[in-house]
Regions:
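Extreme N-terminal flexible tails
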Residues: 1-24, 33
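An anion-binding catalytic pocket shared by soluble metabolic enzymes
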Residues: 27, 34-121
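Histidine-centered divalent metal-coordination motifs
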Residues: 124-128
């Protein structure tokens, strides 16, 4: 039985996403993306999409599109906060933050962000 079987999966609830007004500045949009990214990690952690160190989710920086925010290595998804996120460039340099990142995650996401400059975020995770 997997984590999403009808026996163990949480009951689905529907919700409606309201349109969002464009951000007034790069800083406002950056905060919005980082908050949503941290919330995504916590949701993934809550529902079991957090096996080991294999998962990573990234969001492109709005001001510097060749850079993106990624989770630090060794922090459980359910514990990630906005302040934990690391800003990296396509070469793997950590520009903001002082924690290591998952090298496999960097390799996957840097290729995705280079190949798809129109995409804002990407996720890769594993579960049992």
């Amino acid at each position: 039985m997997n984590a999403l079987s009808p026996v163990t999966a949480p009951k689905a609830r529907s919700f409606r996403l309201e349109p969002r007004q464009p951000a007034a500045s790069h800083e406002e949009e950056r905060l919005h993306r980082k908050q949503r990214l941290a919330a995504t990690f916590r949701l993934f952690g809550r529902y079991g999409f957090d096996q080991g160190l294999a998962g990573h989710v990234t969001a492109r920086d709005p001001e510097f599109p060749e850079q993106y925010w990624i989770n630090p290595l060794g922090v459980h998804f359910s514990q990630i906060r906005t302040s934990d996120l690391q800003l990296v460039d396509h070469d793997g340099n950590i520009l903001i933050g002082n924690r290591p990142i998952n090298n496999a995650g960097f390799t996957i996401h840097s290729a995705l962000h280079k190949a798809r400059p129109d995409e804002i975020a990407a996720a890769h995770t594993q579960f049992t």
